[in-house]
């Protein structure tokens, strides 16, 4: 990480100097977040990075989450955590899902292992699929927020009772709360934007007149985290178990080496019945799990947490407050995210991951508009992109739930489930999301220059070596949750950064041409370094180059002292780790890869396509 750019400092470099908040209004904020779940905290952590944005986050609960709820962390979410600076801590604490085993009954009705497969294919991500309590993920986000200059912390015990628009004023959304910790006290917050991350029973969604639409599978399931003794051989593997007559069981080993989570199929519900009507107990869950695992034993010593739920797939028709006929014409002011706008079964491990991805998509867009870097139409892309993703998730979850609960006859269903699981492993890893062409994602005319960086999909990292200090690192780890766009300039095979080479020509254009993106941002009064981060990757042996000879754009002066930033130039690594080989980058031509602040590839262009670079950003950056 970088610090000292504004002068020598001591102490923890992750803790930013606190702002003087004496002039800040307690009742008028830029962004109000309702709900402290994964979606709300992802958004709050991202917005806390911007000293010029005021954020207020509230929750109806009395304090931070302690136990239960989601625990599966997809590879893509781990990549996102790296942008916030805590992916390595998750790796250290979490259970790593390395393999998945499948069990089904034999002719005598006893379960037996039918297959054991690798959970995540090689090279899919530099991070593993992990399991860690949602409460710990909350802890990490809360720490990021508290370490920010705002020292941002949630206000708990706040129940939303009213949300309305106040007309054409700066803080046009007014929210009223009951203060549950103080008798007869209410609190009113005026905000430019409100984001409802308040779960499946969202009051923000209700205030917008939106509904979760879909249906229930009328299937009752139980879930429990247990400490138990068993002679079942795969208890420390992720297991999908389908019994002859007692339903299905999904085993997810938990962090810490001893605890396991069990998702237990119970019974079908009547059309007018709900999970709460069955009065399910933890003893009933244990008994059903024992029946499914037979002839293996299960001796539960402690139940850490349990719940019963009904499978359903539901999604909102809109993720913001703009009516269908006004979309693109009217600025959205209120958004919903996470379970507030889509619900599904937990067995594919997508809930927390998709919720966090919702607000990671929204956060940088809000910041860009609030800071004057982009006009408001950028905000409309949140609904366009994430609503489509939610619809896709619902279809996937419906198929997964159907196959997992299907009645067994000749083994064909079990085999189909195994094939489906293997086929969709990339989806469950979170790396199959592809955003459609839009204001911020191109149509891919030059995709052939780097086929391993698919436009509209996440920037698939690869290792490189930093020129200045020979440090190996993953290229995507330079993309932090700071709201900046990235331009990665991949040099052609002859480029050494000398005058006349592609990198030098690109640098000269950016710095000298008054119409370049760099100089247009300066003309508009914007701090270039707050908007774009430009880096270079050369194909030469790093030992044959000197960073001080690189074009000026790639060794810029930065910070209050005007110090040189030596960390923007990289070289390839010989052998199988070569980024040009791993991502199929055209070695002869090189290219420019433009990456969005949420780590998705927006455009790929020839290295000399200066006008196209300008045109891409002119389409949505503020004039």
PLM regions and their residue ranges:
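Conserved mid-domain beta->alpha element of the FAD-binding
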Residues: 36-44, 141, 196, 303, ...
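A conserved beta-strand/loop element that lines the FAD pocket in flavoprotein oxidoreductases
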Residues: 148-160, 298
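Extreme N-terminal leader/targeting segments of oxidoreductases
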Residues: 1-31, 46-53, 329
């Amino acid at each position: 990480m970088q610090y000292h750019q504004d002068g020598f400092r001591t102490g923890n470099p992750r803790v930013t100097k606190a702002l003087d908040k004496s002039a800040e209004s307690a009742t008028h904020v830029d962004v109000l977040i309702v709900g402290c779940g994964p979606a709300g905290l992802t958004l709050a952590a991202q917005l806390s990075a911007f000293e010029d944005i005021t954020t207020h986050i509230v929750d109806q609960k009395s304090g931070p989450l302690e136990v239960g709820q989601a625990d599966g962390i997809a590879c893509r979410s781990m990549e996102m955590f790296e942008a916030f600076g805590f992916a390595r801590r998750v790796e250290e604490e979490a259970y790593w899902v390395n393999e998945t085993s499948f069990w089904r009954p034999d002719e005598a009705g006893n379960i037996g292992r039918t297959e054991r497969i690798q959970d995540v294919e090689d090279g899919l991500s530099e991070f593993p699929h992990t399991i860690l309590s949602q409460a710990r993920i909350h802890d990490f986000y809360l720490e990021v927020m508290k370490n920010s200059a705002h020292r941002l912390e949630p206000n708990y015990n706040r129940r939303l009772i009213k949300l309305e628009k106040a007309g054409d004023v700066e803080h046009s959304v007014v929210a009223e709360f009951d203060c549950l910790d103080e008798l007869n006290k209410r609190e009113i917050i005026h905000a430019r934007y409100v984001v409802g991350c308040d779960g499946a029973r969202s009051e923000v969604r209700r205030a917008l007149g939106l509904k979760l639409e879909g249906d229930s599978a009328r299937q009752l399931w139980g879930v429990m985290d247990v400490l138990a003794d068993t002679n079942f051989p795969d208890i420390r593997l992720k297991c999908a178990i389908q019994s002859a007559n007692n339903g299905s069981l999904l085993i997810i080993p938990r962090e810490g080496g001893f605890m396991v989570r069990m998702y237990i199929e119970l019974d079908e519900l009547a059309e007018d019945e709900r999970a709460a009507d069955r009065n399910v107990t933890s003893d009933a869950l244990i008994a059903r799990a024992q029946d499914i695992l037979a002839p293996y034993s299960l001796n539960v010593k402690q139940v850490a947490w349990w719940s019963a739920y009904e499978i359903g797939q539901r999604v909102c028709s809109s993720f913001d407050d703009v009516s269908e006929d006004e979309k693109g014409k009217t600025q959205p002011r209120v958004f919903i995210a996470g379970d507030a706008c889509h619900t599904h079964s937990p067995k594919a491990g997508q809930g927390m991951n998709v919720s966090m991805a919702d607000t990671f998509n929204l956060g940088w867009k809000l910041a860009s508009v609030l800071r004057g870097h982009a006009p408001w139409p950028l905000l409309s892309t949140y609904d366009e992109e994430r609503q489509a993703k939610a619809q896709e998730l619902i279809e996937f979850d419906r198929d997964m739930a159907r196959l997992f609960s299907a009645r067994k006859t000749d083994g064909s269903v079990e085999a189909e489930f195994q094939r489906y699981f293997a086929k969709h492993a990339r989806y469950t890893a979170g790396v199959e999301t592809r955003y459609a062409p839009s204001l911020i994602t191109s149509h891919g005319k030059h995709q052939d220059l780097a086929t391993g960086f698919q436009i509209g999909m996440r920037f698939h990292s690869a290792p490189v070596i930093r020129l200045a200090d020979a440090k190996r690192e993953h290229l995507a780890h330079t993309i932090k949750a700071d709201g900046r766009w990235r331009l990665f300039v991949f040099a052609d095979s002859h480029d050494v950064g000398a005058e006349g080479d592609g990198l030098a020509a690109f640098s000269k254009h950016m710095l000298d041409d008054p119409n370049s993106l760099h100089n247009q941002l300066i003309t508009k009064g914007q701090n270039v370094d707050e908007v774009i981060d430009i880096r270079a990757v050369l194909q030469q042996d790093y030992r044959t180059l000197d960073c001080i000879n690189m074009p000026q754009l790639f060794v810029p002066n930065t910070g209050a002292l005007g110090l040189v930033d030596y960390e923007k130039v990289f070289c390839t690594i010989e052998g199988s780790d070569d980024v040009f080989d791993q991502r199929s980058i055209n070695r002869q031509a090189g290219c420019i890869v433009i990456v969005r602040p949420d780590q998705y590839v927006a455009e790929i262009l020839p290295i000399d396509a200066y006008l196209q670079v300008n045109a891409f950003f002119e389409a949505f950056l503020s004039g």
